[in-house]
Amino acid sequence: MPKVALIETKPSKTNFRQEFDGAFEFDQFQLCSNPTIKKVLKKDCDIEIDSSLYDWIILVGSDALKFFTKINSVTEYSGKVVEQKFLPVINPAMLAFKPEARKTWEDSKDSIIGFISGTKQETFVDESIAFGIQDTATANAFIQDAIDYDYTHVALDSETTGLYPRDGHMLGLSLSYDGEKGAYIDTECFDETTEALLQELFDKKTVIFHNAKFDLAFFQYHFNFNFPQIEDTMLLHYLIDENPGTHGLKQLAMKYTPYGDYEQPMYEWIGEYRKSHGILKEQFSWDLIPFHTMKVYAAMDSLVTFLVYEKFKKIKQNAKLLWVYDNILIPGTRFLLNVQDNGV
């Protein structure tokens, strides 16, 4: 059995062995040994632990997570693997005053037990499932494969140099047509055949976006593509969860796919690049990222969009939600595109 440590903020009455159903043994630690301190600061932490002795380290709550990693949101990462050995989890004590978090706790508990027991494996992202294309012939062949594939839909995403098509251009597009792989295609390799094949694809298939209003603006403005049938996973999520800050592709990918925070290495690269070049956050643009650095993570965007849609399409089985989606949200997206482009 793997060697496991559990770290909470300070001594508490929570019976973690019971909370985890006695599924595994662990050594228990606290960041701060003084239970009387209300808000534990870094200066209060007196924990002594050799993390190299443990295969898994469960981090209970945001304080422990922030102490050992660069991540702040324990709710977002609860039950996920961070940096290969850390397992963040919300504090089950919070359920007494926040019972709506019960499902998050139960799902996280099952996930952690699975990782520790070996019945659940971390899913790694590499070029076997997410890859880049900079060759015209290879790009055209991939798009033709998407056209010929027997699924009725494809997922599409774009990487751009700006927020608005008049201020920037498209660096590349990400395409997944089978839910098993995604490709990031450099727009520099497009020729007339590429554009014709893409339009044929968009005419034949339903195209799934995440935040379609953003991507459609660039595809229509720079390439004059038409999209007769679209879906939007962000809008589908709005139908079941109206809370702000919960609709990002990363959050949904972490919750509904096995791929977790697949973009984290790229954002670490961005942080190092900004630091070494003295660039402020607002001065950074995506064209500063080399293709070979971006390709895997950009390709993953369309793959996880495809997988999230597979989870969300059953939402449309609810007739009332379907009416809102088909008659308000999707038409509203197209209307806002016209307003953005032409004004009111």
Model-identified regions with their sequence ranges:
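A polyanion-binding, active-site-adjacent surface
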Residues: M1-E122
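Short hydrophobic beta-strand that contains or immediately precedes a catalytic carboxylate
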Residues: L6-I7, V89, V154-D157, I230-E231
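Short, intrinsically disordered, charge-balanced linker/junction segments flanking boundaries
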Residues: P11, F20-F24, M170-G172, V339-V344
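Short acidic, Gly/Ser-rich segments with clustered Asp/Glu that frequently serve as metal-coordination loops
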Residues: P11-S12, Y149, H153-R166
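Acidic beta-strand-to-loop metal/phosphate-binding motif
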Residues: D55-S62, A155, K205-A212
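Active-site-proximal helix-loop-helix substrate-binding element of RNase H-like nuclease domains
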Residues: A93-L95, K103-E106, D110, I116-Q134, ...
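Extended, well-ordered alpha-helical scaffold/bundle regions in very large, multi-domain proteins
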Residues: W323-V344
